[in-house]
Curated annotation (Swiss-Prot):
Chain positions covered by the region annotation Glycosyltransferase: 173-652
Principal EC category: transferase
Modified residues (Phosphothreonine): T189
GO BP term, pick one: trehalose biosynthetic process
Protein name as annotated: Putative alpha,alpha-trehalose-phosphate synthase [UDP-forming] 106 kDa subunit
Bias (Polar residues) ranges: 73-84
Organism: Schizosaccharomyces pombe (strain 972 / ATCC 24843) (Fission yeast)
Catalytic activity from the UniProt record: D-glucose 6-phosphate + UDP-alpha-D-glucose = alpha,alpha-trehalose 6-phosphate + UDP + H(+)
Any one GO CC term of the record: alpha,alpha-trehalose-phosphate synthase complex (UDP-forming)
Length: 944
């Protein structure tokens, strides 16, 4: 059994360095307690809820120092004992007193602490977390800012801030002298010798998607998940590191932490992450189209960096790939990796999961690199999204922008491959949360917070300071709530946890103004009541769980978001108190929880204000009913089952793809012997593009048609054979075409009308009256009023596509595109027609067949017609053969395969052929690249 290579931009653990010149043992003793000094380079699993925002958790950690996995038998030893700090002080409204410097707290360490704080707001180039008291630092970054300073003039005001960083850096490192300025003109200098024997430490990282990593950890503990390696960056600048040190780091990662380190250049990483991901992809995927000059500069200059980082990941994956390995690529940072790996490993198992929303096609098409991104994603065998809406948007976008075939079951046909598109929402790990809730730190904080907020209604919220999170609309709605309902002004608090993010500098002033306005109007000095508490730091998980326990409601007012695991955790934590959840309708979780949550439109301030009151006045019976229903919904699949399920789906999708690729070329030898030995045969052949090359219905290639008629006469002359031809043409057209094949069965308009073969001597003439009596109307009594509506839709697109025309038959409507002057316009019209009809509330479906768009009733299909033919003729066939070039006939091939599981005494021999250059069928037994080759092989079968 192979491994799983799990690619994510950040590894679950990061690296910090010590520049002290003391021996290893002394450093170990200094860094850790004595009993831990022997193995201080140790990794611990990230907890599932360390980062509340599962979709962009690298900026949204709840933990400044991540707790280790809790052992249910000894929870206390694994969670740090709480101590008073900035969080408690902020909640109480009193700032903690400054610490007095001592010999145990040298100025260097204080400087590093300040440096850490400054670095945290600058993305990837951060000092290592210093929460355990270790003296750790980072190598200097050598990145150059991709957009030139002349374009991004707004960055000039940061230069004084940069000089402060430089001063801190000089004080913090004895061996380094470097500049943190992002401009190309200022380069860093350092002493390379200082890095040769530097001691480093690997421990859990504050970057990355903690909910994802916890799901993998939970699945691993369940013993249902395969061995795996993480592939990602280590979260630090690496250009300054000598190769020998990188080798040491990589060795420890692979041997101790099951991780493969990717080393992009600092310039590429900053351009990729800080610029393209954060300023282009993240806003666009959340419906905030970047249109300012700064964003345009990022897009123009950082796309190349984005490509290079994706290529670095692909190179690492390919270089370490072994036979039978599976590759699982995650999130919008690595959208190009699937295609890059597919080009070099055509038969690899590749899955891709997008943890953030996928926008509608009208938004996605605004990206200049839309084609490259879509094709990059389509390199996978399976694409996973959080909810069906996101999967639908992706399918719709592919249909409109890449011109590929989309099937109703969420399968994309692209470059002779079938890609499955599925929705699989991530979930929480209830076992881990239970162990945390039972731990002393959570109990302690719950008691502290209950005492602090006794007699108050607490409405909790946790968001980054990002415009997408809807903080502004939330605060305005809360202000209106207080204005309209004065009885809540003295006893209700909106407690907003807002950890820092890359967008702080731009968004914070707007939020601060609103908070100040509300608190100025409704605070009470005498009672020390403040209606809005804005916490600008990351909370420990114990603290946040305690906050959720004592809160009277939680609101997620995001303008766009995937699955809100914060909301799911709140629901689970509130199983005893049953307090309600206020949820934006634009959050993916809303489609899962439905009306059990209080669903709001974040743009409607008045309705959101009413939602606050509804949450605070809801009866206990109603709260309990809603909470129970929501718990049942979120616990259908936990975090472990999510990871295990997606792993299984990657394998299944890959197997289907391999089975399709293994389809042999159709030759007479494949069915010659079974054909000769059979006593009763059923032969089903599609007309257009299978037994006849097909132009328009008036321009058939006559030589091919004559050859087809000759072959059909040979087959129908054998009394052991029952032969049917399927077609999209009408009854009259098919009778005219095949009047020289009197013993032929015909299925017209793709299953709407069926004519059985006449009985008796094949040489006897058959009258028109007798032929007419043989036709069976399969749509008799079926509602066909939709035809007028569909015809109008088809006419709309035909008028805009030169050479296209619409044909209304007895039970189908066809848009003919074969003679369209512009092939690209014709393909666009076909896709749009199918989408317009299939998304319209009419009892019919439209499919693309041989340069036609055919719309028929949902009550009929070629598979149903095939089943009726089989039953009507006794059903005791010992040989069933079918051939088609229509992807829609894959259902017929699937029906034939079911005979192999039949419990009948005599199981018929079945064989299906896909006649197509692109191998459109996954259920066919063989394929033929064209009509002439297929006819030649079938002629050999008969004449053998």
């Amino acid at each position: 059994m192979g491994r799983i290579l799990i690619a994510h931009l950040f590894l679950p653990s990061s690296v910090g360095f010590s520049f002290d010149t003391v021996p290893h043992d002394e450093v170990g003793s200094k860094f850790m307690q004595k009993e831990e000094s022997k193995d201080w380079i140790a990794d611990t699993p990230l907890d599932e809820s360390a980062i509340v925002s599962e979709e962009e958790s690298d900026d949204d950690s709840l933990l400044s120092d991540l707790p280790e996995e809790i052992d249910s038998t000894n929870a206390q030893s694994n969670i740090a004992t709480p101590s008073p700090g900035t969080v408690a002080a902020a909640i109480s409204g009193i700032q903690p007193p400054p610490k007095t410097p001592s010999s145990d707290s040298p100025s260097l360490e204080n400087s590093l602490s300040n440096l850490n704080d400054l670095f945290k707001s600058r993305g990837r180039h951060m000092a290592f977390s210093k929460n355990d008291g270790t003296n750790l630092s980072l190598p200097p970054s050598r990145h150059q800012s991709p957009p030139p300073s002349s374009v991004l003039a707004s960055q000039r005001h940061h230069r004084r801030h940069d000089s402060e960083l430089e001063e801190f850096a000089r004080r913090a490192s004895r061996s380094l002298s470097f500049s943190m300025n992002g401009t190309p003109q200022r380069r860093m200098t350092f002493d390379a010798e200082a890095w040769k024997n530097v001691i480093f430490k690997i421990k859990p990282s504050s970057f990355g998607n903690a909910s994802f990593y916890n799901a993998i950890s939970a699945a691993t503990r369940s013993k249902q998940f395969d061995d795996h390696l993480f592939v990602g960056t280590c979260g630090i600048p690496t250009d300054s590191l000598p190769d020998s040190l990188k080798e040491r780091i990589s060795h420890d990662y692979i041997t101790e932490h099951s991780s493969l380190v990717v080393y992009p250049t600092d310039t590429d990483f900053v351009g990729h992450y800080n610029h393209y991901c954060k300023n282009i992809l993240w806003p666009t995927f959340h419906y905030q189209i970047p249109d300012n000059p700064k964003s345009k500069a990022y897009e123009d200059h950082s796309w190349a960096n984005y490509v290079k980082v994706n290529k670095a990941f692909a190179d690492t994956i390919v270089d370490n790939y072994e036979q039978d390995d599976m590759i699982w690529i995650n999130d919008y940072h690595l959208l190009l990796v699937p295609e890059m790996v597919r080009e070099r490993l055509p038969r690899a198992k590749i899955g891709f999961f997008l943890h953030i929303p996928f926008p509608s096609s009208e938004v996605f098409r605004c990206l200049a690199t839309r084609q490259e991104i879509l094709k990059g994603m389509l390199g996978a065998n399976i694409l996973g999204f959080q909810i069906p809406e996101f999967a639908y948007h992706f399918l719709q976008t592919c249909s409109r922008l890449v011109n590929i075939d989309i099937r109703k079951n969420g399968v994309v046909s692209f470059e002779n491959r079938q890609i499955d598109v599925i929705a699989l929402p991530i979930s929480i790990d209830p076992g881990f949360i239970d162990r945390c809730l039972a731990s002393p730190p959570v109990e302690h904080w719950a008691k502290v917070l209950q005492d602090r907020f006794r007699g108050k209604h607490i409405i909790l919220s946790h968001d980054k300071l990002d415009p997408i999170r809807g903080l502004r609309s939330k605060l305005i709605s809360f202000e209106r709530f207080l204005q309209k309902y004065p009885e809540y002004r003295e006893n209700t608090i909106l407690l907003q946890v807002a950890p820092e993010s890359l967008q702080d500098s731009e968004h914070l002033p707007h939020i601060s103004d609103i908070v100040t306005r509300i608190n100025s109007a409704y605070s009470n000095i005498a009672s020390r009541h403040v209606p809005v508490i804005l916490l600008r730091q990351k909370l420990g998980y114990a603290q946040f769980l305690a906050l959720m326990m004592i809160s009277d409601a939680l609101i997620d007012n995001s303008l766009r978001e995937g699955i809100s695991l914060t909301s799911h955790q709140f629901i689970y934590v509130q199983r005893k108190r049953h307090r309600p959840l206020i949820l934006s309708e634009f959050v993916g979780s809303a489609s899962i929880l439905n009306d059990n949550a209080i669903i709001v439109n974040p743009w409607d301030y008045s309705k959101t204000a009413e939602a606050f009151r509804t949450a605070l006045t809801m009866s206990e019976e109603e709260c309990q009913k809603r909470n129970k229903a929501m718990c049942n919904l979120i616990l259908r699949h936990d975090a472990a089952s999510w990871a295990v399920t997606f792993q299984s789906l990657i394998k299944e999708s890959w197997k289907e793809q391999i089975d399709m690729q293994r389809i042999p070329a159709f030759t007479a030898q494949l069915i010659k012997e079974p054909y000769q030995n059979a006593q009763k045969r059923l032969i089903l052949l599609y007309f257009e593009g299978t037994i006849s090359t097909w132009g328009s219905q008036y321009h058939n290639v006559m030589t091919s048609l004559q050859r087809t008629i000759n072959l059909l006469n040979m087959l129908t002359s054998d009394p052991k054979n029952t032969v049917y031809v399927f077609s999209a043409l009408s009854c009259q057209e098919l009778e005219q075409l095949f009047q020289r094949v009197p013993k032929l069965g015909i299925v017209a308009e793709n299953g709407c009308f069926v004519r059985s073969p006449p009985k008796g001597d094949a040489t006897m003439p058959v009258s028109k009256k007798e032929i007419a009596e043989l036709w069976k109307n399969k749509v008799l009594g079926t509602d066909l009023t939709w035809m007028k509506t569909v015809s109008e839709i088809f006419e709309y697109y035909a008028e805009r596509t030169t050479g296209a025309y619409v044909e209304n038959k007895d039970a189908t409507v066809i848009l003919h595109l074969r003679e369209a002057e512009d092939d690209e316009a014709a393909m666009w019209a076909a896709k749009e027609c199918c989408e317009s009809v299939n998304n319209f509330n009419v009892p019919c479906s439209a499919t693309i067949q041989n340069d036609m768009v055919v719309c028929r009733s949902n009550k009929v299909s070629k598979r149903l017609a095939a089943e009726d033919i089989y039953s009507a003729n006794g059903g005791d066939y010992d040989f069933i053969f079918a051939a088609s070039n229509d992807p829609d006939d894959d259902t017929v091939f699937s029906w034939m395969k079911n005979f192999k599981q039949s419990k009948k005494e005599v199981v018929p021999f079945t064989f299906s052929v896909c006649v197509s250059e692109h191998g459109n069928s996954t259920n066919a037994d063989a394929e033929s690249s064209g009509v002439f080759g297929f006819l030649q092989a079938l002629e050999k079968v008969y004449s053998a």
